[in-house]
Amino acid sequence: TFEPGCRNNWHIHHADKGGGQILVCTAGEGVYQEWGKEPQILHPGDVVYIKPGVKHYHGAAADSWFSHIAVECPGENCSNEWCEPVTDEQYNSAKIERF
């Protein structure tokens, strides 16, 4: 669970074969972004598959708690690489769409 505004650093899930990560969003509103792409707003019930080798981050929207189940997909020679923090500019580029 992430408190409002909390996010992890950019990171990469590496694997020689298989691997990756699945996020199952369970509560609140979250943000997911792949390096070089627009951020996505996440809502309960959303599922994100992150291919191995993709630099990304995820966390809570600025004004919402966010919970998800993170599943590390099985693979060979899997490892995580933690990178630089997500800047406020990168994080704040996410636009929240209310239902």
Where are these regions (language model features)?
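Conserved metal-binding segment of the jelly-roll/cupin
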Residues: 5, 42-63, 73
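Residue-level recognition of conserved beta-strand positions in structured domain cores
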Residues: 12, 26, 34-36, 60, ...
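Histidine-centered divalent metal-coordination motifs
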Residues: 11-16, 56-58
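A short beta-strand-loop-beta hairpin characteristic of the jelly-roll/cupin
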Residues: 7, 17-44, 54
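Conserved hydrophobic/aromatic beta-strand scaffold that supports enzyme active sites
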Residues: 1, 22, 39, 47-49, ...
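N-terminal first-folded block
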Residues: 1-14
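A short, sequence-level motif marking secondary-structure junctions
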Residues: 15, 46-48, 87-88
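Double-stranded beta-helix
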Residues: 57-99
